[in-house]
């Protein structure tokens, strides 16, 4: 559901175009105007020149990646669920796996960022990177990791999920919201 305070803004438009059926349904519930689904194209040049050394990541380790921006509502992105799932899947602590949590703007959300760091510090295989990367660096990071994880509570579209899948990475994602337009049992879990 979209915020009620957005409803007056909808009056300025003749129609609304939405990047996912999830958003289309949410917007349509708040207006009588036409609301159309227009899928987003995901296309980019394949990044080159990046390796794990560029990001100071371990070699010979299967790396799961989560990418999010603190401005996109920390609780909605649900990074603690990723940490908990990682710990449950690999409880011994000696499996050759790692979880890379790439965030940005943690300094502007210190309470949430500190909670994330506290949870991440419990397992030395979890690496937290809070930095602003150029778009090709984010794609390069996706490329050098082995799988993408998003245990979100809601995604409008799921751009990072789509990008990682286009790079050929397995996606482990919540079966809810905007990403369900393109994440299916035959291409993700």
Where are these regions (language model features)?
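Nucleotide-activated donor-binding/catalytic signature segment of Leloir-type glycosyltransferases, i.e.
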Residues: 110-139
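Conserved donor-binding/catalytic core segment of Leloir-type glycosyltransferases
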Residues: 58-77, 83-86, 99-101
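Short hydrophobic beta-strand element within catalytic cores of glycosyltransferases
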Residues: 170-173, 183
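Short alpha-helical donor nucleotide-sugar binding micro-motif in glycosyltransferases
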Residues: 10, 139-145
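Aromatic "clamp/platform" in nucleotide-sugar-dependent glycosyltransferases that forms part
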Residues: 153
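Nucleotide-sugar donor-binding and catalytic loop/hinge architecture
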Residues: 48-64, 91-94
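A short hydrophobic beta-strand element within the catalytic core of glycosyltransferases
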Residues: 148-149
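Donor nucleotide-sugar binding/catalytic pocket of nucleotide-sugar-dependent glycosyltransferases
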Residues: 14-25, 32-48
């Amino acid at each position: 559901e979209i915020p009620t305070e957005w409803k007056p803004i909808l009056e300025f438009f003749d129609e609304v175009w939405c990047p996912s059926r999830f958003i289309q349904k949410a917007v349509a519930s708040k207006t009588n105007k036409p609301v159309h689904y227009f899928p987003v194209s995901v296309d980019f040049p394949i990044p080159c020149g990046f390796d794990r050394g560029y990001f100071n990541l371990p070699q010979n380790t299967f790396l799961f990646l989560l990418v999010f921006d603190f401005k996109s509502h920390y609780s909605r992105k649900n990074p603690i669920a990723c940490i908990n799932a990682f710990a449950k899947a690999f409880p011994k602590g000696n499996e050759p796996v790692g979880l890379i949590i790439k965030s940005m703007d943690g300094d502007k959300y210190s309470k949430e960022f500190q909670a994330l760091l506290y949870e991440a510090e419990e397992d030395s295989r979890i690496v937290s990177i809070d930095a602003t990367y150029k778009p090709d660096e984010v794609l390069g990071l996706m490329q050098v990791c082995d799988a993408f994880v998003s245990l979100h509570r809601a995604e409008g579209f799921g751009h990072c999920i789509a990008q990682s899948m286009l790079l050929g990475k397995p996606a482990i994602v919540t079966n809810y919201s905007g990403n369900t337009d393109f994440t299916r049992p035959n291409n993700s879990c």
